[in-house]
Structure formats: structure tokens, C-alpha cells
Regions:
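A short glycine-rich, Lys/Arg-flanked "PGG" loop and its adjoining helix->strand segment in the class I
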Residues: 163-178
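A conserved beta-strand element that flanks and buttresses the S-adenosyl-L-methionine
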Residues: 149
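Short catalytic micro-motifs in class I SAM-dependent methyltransferases
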Residues: 152-155
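Short, well-structured beta-strand/strand-turn elements
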Residues: 233-241
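A short hydrophobic/small-residue beta-strand
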Residues: 179-180, 234
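Short alpha-helix
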Residues: 215-230
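N-terminal charged/capping segments associated with class I S-adenosyl-L-methionine
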Residues: 1-143, 161, 183-211, 215, ...
Length: 345
């Protein structure tokens, strides 16, 4: 096999810079340069809850799925989505599964860093998603999964890798399986049309830093093209406006926006501190930038929001049974060969 030009994280070694802890592998290779400390873990959990509320607690964007084997790419340090899938897949009475099984599905959660500790039913895999999946024939084997979940990887995957990455995800699915993707465009928008001095400045620094590391900060707008090129069918897209601040007329979105204001400020810190400071910004200037962003977030007349791009598509059927209910209800073929059992201990 030819040598693999992309690096893989070999340890969870960290570096302490600017008052925060970062994964050494991340900052050395320009991949998701955000902290890995408790403050960041709490932010990720809160942000996950906001996104879950925005999508009305839908774990699966294609409706009526009952996946047995799930791959979660960009699972986050706390693997919140994977854990929620497992919590909701606990076997109920009348299940035909073995008495030794605790869950109706298995989830492999992939990221470059995971916290210590085990999560029942979830296999944690350390993997740089810039590496072609052919270099792993176990958890990333072809034709293995019913559902692949990929989210918030714009600052992790090289711009030149995205087409091949989506193709890799396509090839990990069984016929009839689904891929769902979610990306955010952290260029804050204002329904008022007024200019955003500080938020736009933050975005310019952040996006230029990502582009300098061969990342595409606007990749959410390209996902449908990548999926079509990879051969997906039944492609659907659900763009969202994530409100920031308590301005929306809809009570549910108004509440989400109220809670998102605090999380958005934390997100600007987490996503921005490494890149801003590395660009030569002094601590006092960074704090002034964040304070200016906070003032703009507090102005409800601006009606701020973050664009989100949710998209999903299906790998073409290959002789498997499927119930057509809006083209999205997938039933696994009971005769198919299952992968080796996963040790959940």
C-alpha cells in the first residue's frame, strides 16, 4: 500500500497557550484549533443542545430511520449526538435482538480527540478525517453503515479533500443508507441590513486563518454539489437561520436566540482565540474585539443570525428492501452479512 501523506494524531498531548489548553496535533497541523479544556466541553454540550432544539430534537434528518450501524464523523470531544442516539436506541419489550444486546444499534464516533471514559454502545475512534478512509479497513470499511452523520467540520477538513471525503462517506454506506451533513457559516448576518463592525472583523480574521490552512469556511453552501457528484440520490436541503439574541417573533425561536447569545459569545472565543492571537493580536485587543461583538449581539434591532446548512441524501439501493414513505424509510435487509461484533465493555 502506498504511504499515507496525511498525519494521524498519535496521542492526546496538549499545549497551554493564551490561558487555554489545545490539542497539540490540532495546532501543529491547523485542524480545528479550538481548546480542549472543560470550558470548551461545556460550550460544545450547550451548543449541541441549541442545535438539537433548532431541529426540534430530530436526530435523523431523513424521517423514519431505524439504523443498526451508525458512523458519526466530527463527533466532538463529548460525543453528544452519538450518546443521544444510543440512549434512544435502548431495546424495548418485544425486541427480536439477542438478550445479550443492550441497544438496537451501534455507533462509531470519529474525531481527532475524545475525552477519557467509555460511553455504552459507542466506539470512540481517533482519526484525522483528511486521511482517505481506505487506510482503515475496520471501523471505516466500505458498505458497512445504515447512516452516516457529519457535522461542523469546516475548520477540520482541507478544502481540497471535501469531494473525496463525501465520496468516502458514500462508499461507507450500504445500499439504501443515508448521509446527513450539517455545517455552519459563522459569518453573522443581520436582518436589519446594518453593517456589523466587530462581528465582521472577527469573521475576516477567522476565515482568512482557515483559508491559510487550506480550509473552506463557506463549505456549507457546496454540500449539495459534493453529494450529487458522489452519486447520492433523494438529496434534500434544509437551510436554517440560528437566531442570536432575543428578537424573533416566534416564541420558540425567541427562546433559542436568547440562550444562543451566551453560547455564541463563547463560540467566538473558542474559534477565534488561537487564530487571532497567532495573527499578532494582543490579549487586550482580542478582548476589545470580543466586547465589541457582545455589544452587537445585545442589539436586538440588528436581528442577528448564523446561517446553517443541513443536507441529506441516500446511497442508491442495491437489492435491499425499502418502504417508500416520502422516500426516506429504510428497513435493513435481514439476510445481509453483519460486521464483527463490537466490544462495548
Amino acid at each position: 500500500m502506498t504511504s499515507n501523506p496525511q498525519p494521524q494524531p498519535r496521542s492526546g498531548a496538549s499545549v497551554h497557550e493564551y490561558g487555554r489548553d489545545f490539542l497539540a496535533f490540532s495546532v501543529q497541523h491547523g485542524i480545528h484549533c479550538v481548546p480542549i479544556d472543560d470550558e470548551e466541553l461545556n460550550r460544545q454540550a450547550d451548543f449541541y443542545d441549541i442545535i438539537s432544539r433548532l431541529f426540534e430534537r430530530r436526530l435523523f434528518l431523513p424521517t423514519d430511520l431505524t439504523p443498526e450501524f451508525v458512523l458519526d464523523c466530527g463527533s466532538g470531544s463529548g460525543i453528544e449526538w452519538a450518546e443521544e442516539v444510543m440512549e434512544k436506541s435502548e431495546l424495548g419489550p418485544g425486541s427480536s435482538s439477542s438478550e445479550d444486546d443492550d441497544f438496537a444499534c451501534q455507533v462509531v464516533a470519529v474525531d481527532i480527540f475524545h475525552t477519557e471514559g467509555s460511553s455504552p454502545g459507542v466506539v470512540k475512534k481517533i482519526w484525522n478525517l483528511n486521511v482517505a478512509f481506505r487506510y482503515d479497513q475496520e471501523e471505516l470499511a466500505r458498505d458497512k453503515y445504515d447512516l452516516v452523520n457529519s457535522r461542523f467540520l469546516a475548520d477540520s477538513i482541507d478544502a481540497s479533500r471535501w469531494g473525496a471525503y463525501v465520496q468516502d462517506l458514500h462508499d461507507r454506506l450500504r445500499g439504501g443508507g443515508w448521509l446527513q451533513m450539517l455545517e455552519a457559516h459563522f459569518h453573522f448576518q443581520s436582518r436589519s441590513g446594518r453593517p456589523l463592525e466587530y462581528l465582521s472583523r472577527w469573521w475576516n480574521i477567522h476565515s482568512q486563518a482557515l483559508e491559510g490552512h487550506n480550509k473552506d469556511p463557506r463549505v456549507g453552501t457546496e454540500l449539495s454539489r459534493y453529494m450529487a457528484n458522489a452519486g447520492f440520490t433523494s438529496i434534500s436541503m434544509e437551510p436554517k437561520q440560528l437566531p442570536v439574541g432575543e428578537w424573533h417573533q416566534d416564541p420558540r425561536l425567541r427562546e433559542i436566540g436568547r440562550d444562543m447569545k451566551r453560547i455564541a459569545l463563547q463560540t467566538l472565543r473558542s474559534l477565534g482565540i488561537w487564530h487571532c492571537r497567532r495573527a499578532g493580536m494582543q490579549e487586550v485587543d482580542f478582548e476589545d474585539l470580543i466586547a465589541g461583538c457582545e455589544r452587537e449581539m445585545s442589539d436586538t434591532n440588528l436581528q442577528l443570525y448564523i446561517p446553517l446548512f443541513a443536507i441529506w441524501g441516500q446511497r442508491a439501493e442495491r437489492g435491499q428492501n425499502r418502504v417508500d414513505k416520502g422516500g426516506s424509510a429504510y428497513i435493513p435487509d435481514p439476510s445481509r452479512r453483519l460486521p464483527p461484533p463490537v466490544d462495548w465493555a
